[in-house]
């Protein structure tokens, strides 16, 4: 081996020992004839000192520059009094260098590794192999490795089998666009990259494997956001002969153990909340419980007011009027209220009414608002009592269709909580349960809220009679307002699966064409089964305190789904296209 130790392994116990290090020159300093090199490797940093009385090694140290790859032989010694660096794990010791060998030189990097904050993300991604040398970036990938190791160990110990499922499969409707791969041997036909291993893991349950897991690559051709990538990694889990409570308990224990092992954090039991309660109280099916603000329904107090903005939705069975109290924010400037009004318009809200509570004891005169005059005093007092308003508070109102009000005020709740730093704790895990089976579209058709293979809490006959009110056996784990994982008990009877397909408008011939293999499998003794999939990238992002999943993926794509380092996607030559039986209608433009 070329090295005896990693830099991060050096400590006082090695004092007096000769060691060999290999790594990169992170920093070089010349102090009065003595040269200091900070050597960096995967495990950390070590300071190496070269004295002029060792002429060869001193001359070599004088020639090296940042990011040279070097091998150093020297003796560990305690640092002089006053020279201890508390910011380095090895800051109490240093290495007196005897030999220095340059293994490779380096050009000046495109950006300094010590001053990276002003470097644009595209530049960092173009030179990702340089960006990943920064200790904070390397630590994120080390954390990712520790997380996957902990999860694998837990699942292995719990009797799960790690089974790989195909990457080249067929397109199935799962909610997003597929990445398609043309087949050379089957002209005109295409494989699809999997959006998830959903159907294959269900087939493994039919095959009797009982407990399956996989750290699986998944692909979705969709618009990108801070927490989305065209290719992402899923912790995929499926098990037979367990109900939803069993699966929730098993995976919750896994996450609790993970946080204890990796971050030394102890979680208690995760609270459970129904989808309906989450939407009513927080305006979201993934509420951030660190934020104490809540939505409160007040429509019953506004059905008879002349102000149509309120009375219209208050009398509409599909409408909602809700209030959001912000404690101590009555001094909020009008410009800030205008900014929040513009913000909720993103979610379809037509405005944002408010009441500033200055002195409640004075009645309406103690309230500052353009809407107070439209609400009878008795109703106004009921509303203020219901939301818990006291002097110094501001109360915002939303009135529209239920979905618009919930999403707009739910997003406003999160924004105000962040703006005013209202979080009451650092971590808030929870479960959301009892999701609707379907979302009803404007034309009366239905879309599966999770996916078409989720089992309902009713019989096929009851489901087809009342699809709009049917609940599913689905469950989501939420952490700090981010969906960590979603799962469900699956349909394991053919009759139920066909009933769901019919409600989704999938005709029988299309069922056979796209899902015939699944329907066949359900005829041959499919066991009751269910599972859950966690987004590994999101989980690592949260545990690392990163702002984007791009920070915790070694080689991520940009917001436009491109790899600026390898220049992918790229143009394919004409011969390759002919072999795939593909002709381009328009030639790609040179960039």
UniProtKB/Swiss-Prot annotation:
Highest rank taxon of the organism: Bacteria
Molecular function GO terms recorded: aspartate-tRNA ligase activity; aspartate-tRNA(Asn) ligase activity; ATP binding; nucleic acid binding
GO biological process: aspartyl-tRNA aminoacylation
PROSITE patterns documented for this protein: AA_TRNA_LIGASE_II
TM ranges: none
Subcellular location per the Swiss-Prot or TrEMBL entry: Cytoplasm
Principal subcellular localization: cytoplasm
Site positions per UniProt: Important for tRNA non-discrimination: 31, 82
InterPro entries assigned to the protein according to its UniProt record, in alphabetical order: Aa-tRNA-synt_II, aa-tRNA-synth_II, aa-tRNA-synth_II/BPL/LPL, Asp-tRNA-ligase_1, Asp-tRNA-ligase_1_N, Asp/Asn-tRNA-synth_IIb, AspRS_core, GAD-like_sf
Catalytic activity field: tRNA(Asx) + L-aspartate + ATP = L-aspartyl-tRNA(Asx) + AMP + diphosphate
Binding site for ATP: 220-222, 229, 483, 535-538
Region (Aspartate): 198-201
Cellular-component GO terms for this entry: cytoplasm
Alphabetical keyword list: Aminoacyl-tRNA synthetase, ATP-binding, Cytoplasm, Ligase, Nucleotide-binding, Protein biosynthesis
Protein known as: Aspartate--tRNA(Asp/Asn) ligase
The organism's taxonomic lineage, starting at the top: Bacteria, Pseudomonadati, Pseudomonadota, Gammaproteobacteria, Pseudomonadales
Gene, per the UniProt record: aspS
